[in-house]
């Protein structure tokens, strides 16, 4: 069987529940590996999310949203103000922000962050962490 490659839209429980054996050899990029055997920050996030919501996060978008709020809070702190222009400058100067989904940095003049991407695979109808990479090139949106 040929592998199937997809994007973060594949990051849904439906991939396994609907796909069954047909989901084997699927690989997709997403923002974090949301499993019990993931990183300690992700495990802690899943535990806190479950405590607050009585369910696990459906996919990595919850963790990415958490990182987004944390990144903005960090930028406000570094800016010493919530003035939008100062926060924008602080965001643009972000280097090595340790988010739970990976490290986030911005390059001068580029509004798309350098961030870790997670590649998830399916084998025996189970998700596994295939790779984590930081792309050296990200095309403009």
Question: Which stretches of residues belong to each language-model region?
Answer:
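Extracytosolic ligand-binding ectodomains
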Residues: 1-141
